[in-house]
Amino acid sequence: MSKYNVLIVGSGGREHALAWKVKQSQHVQNVFVAPGNAGTGMDATNVDLDPADHDAVIQFAKENNVGLVIVGPEAPLVAGLVDALTDAGLRAFGPSKAASELEGSKVFCKNLLRSADIPTADYRTFRSADDASRYIKDRFSEPTDPVNVVVKADGLAAGKGVVVCDTRSEALEAIDRIAARKEFGAAGKELIIEERLTGPEVSVLAITDGETIVTLPPAQDHKPANDGDTGPNTGGMGAYCPAPVLDEETLAKVESSILVPVVHAMKRSRRPFKGVLYAGLMLTPAGPKVLEFNVRFGDPECQPLLMRLKTDLVEVMQAVVDGKLEETGPLEFDPRPAICVVMASEGYPADYEKGHAITGIESADKMENVKVFHAGTQRVDGEVVNTGGRVLGVTAMGDSISAAKLQAYKAVREIRWQGAWCRKDISDKALVTADKA
């Protein structure tokens, strides 16, 4: 079979990890990333394309022998880039615009879960800040009453449109930010207030062609900004894979009671799902329940997952595009666990400083079983500088989770820029689980 070129759409740590893994495929000649970052520019070829400009993406793919387009982030998926590529006769990995509603609208997702009898938190939806505020005030009469609810913007908000509330005033403030002040723009045209679930969180990803499902090893993300899972939510400050908190028996239950029913429900609603299905779950005393669904690889979960993957990723993605996933064998993973520590810019997840030169990436990359995946970086005048909130995903493998953690943080200490910071406790939850086992 002749080799072909692959185009990856996006510019984050997930896209750098995808480019790094796709480059290893025996079927691939060149890897292009649009628009990419400083790291993808080292492992692949960056292309100055706006993912929102569908015609430009199509034109580039047609002119450059692109045999597969991989759409990384949620925004271009929700905007229908895969549909545009497919209509133009190109092969694209990722769900259609209609199927991407599973992430693009939390209201759509919750209603689908309810109709398919898939376990999730009880919820109410609201179209106005006044109605939502009235609901909170009616339920909780005193300003200091504990409320235990979660307020969510309906649309995409870069992982920050979810506010976990402990008091009535916090819930009212969240409603005001999302639905009145429109901090997340059109994402706040509707909002959800749902019961707060308790238990450990875990991410289970699966690859599906709409018929066959291949479940991947579970990973655990760290959304809150600060150690001990405190502080505001972020896009994710680190992850590890596998997650020992989810045993084989529970993983099989997640597949049969959550993943398979969702794929069937999407098919019934004439939105067949092809691509990566990401279930964000809470392991409650009553069993696993869905917090959210995403329609792409998680970022940063993608980094440790792909570091462990031994199977040719491009062959799996081609099988999904062709509707032949059942013909691929089981995926092979390195038995060693991997951990990704996100290094962020000062001020993130609020306003952050950028444009500072970063040193030490090369020496960190040379360390055994370490790969530094770039996110918010660019090369300016020969230097790598920070241009985003989440800047690097320092990823390491080890014979145990504690060994992987040690190696990842050893690599983190090599890297410097003004205001750089990270959480110091990524994977500690896994170490606690392992100690109890």
Curated annotation (Swiss-Prot):
Among its keywords, does the record have Cell cycle? Answer: no
* The enzyme's E.C. designation: 6.3.4.13
Amino acids binding Mg(2+): E292, N294
Signal peptide per UniProt: none
Q: Name one GO biological process term.
A: 'de novo' IMP biosynthetic process
Q: Which UniProt keywords apply?
A: ATP-binding, Ligase, Magnesium, Manganese, Metal-binding, Nucleotide-binding, Purine biosynthesis
Q: Report which reactions are catalysed by this protein.
A: 5-phospho-beta-D-ribosylamine + glycine + ATP = N(1)-(5-phospho-beta-D-ribosyl)glycinamide + ADP + phosphate + H(+)
Q: Which cofactor does it need?
A: Mg(2+); Mn(2+)
Q: Gene3D superfamilies given for it?
A: 3.40.50.20, ATP-grasp fold, A domain, ATP-grasp fold, B domain, Phosphoribosylglycinamide synthetase, C-terminal domain
Class of the enzyme per the UniProt entry, highest EC level: ligase
Q: Output the Pfam families linked to this UniProt entry.
A: GARS_A, GARS_C, GARS_N
Metabolic or biological pathway, per its Swiss-Prot or TrEMBL entry:
Purine metabolism; IMP biosynthesis via de novo pathway; N(1)-(5-phospho-D-ribosyl)glycinamide from 5-phospho-alpha-D-ribose 1-diphosphate: step 2/2
Alphabetized GO MF terms: ATP binding; metal ion binding; phosphoribosylamine-glycine ligase activity
Domain (ATP-grasp): residue spans on this chain:
110-322
Cofactor info, note text: Binds 1 Mg(2+) or Mn(2+) ion per subunit.
PROSITE patterns attached to this UniProt entry: ATP_GRASP, GARS
Q: Where does ATP bind?
A: 142-203
Note the superkingdom of the native organism. Bacteria
The family note in this entry says: Belongs to the GARS family.
The protein in question is named: Phosphoribosylamine--glycine ligase
Q: State the organism named in the record.
A: Rhodopirellula baltica (strain DSM 10527 / NCIMB 13988 / SH1)
What does UniProt list as this organism's lineage? Bacteria, Pseudomonadati, Planctomycetota, Planctomycetia, Pirellulales
Originating gene: purD
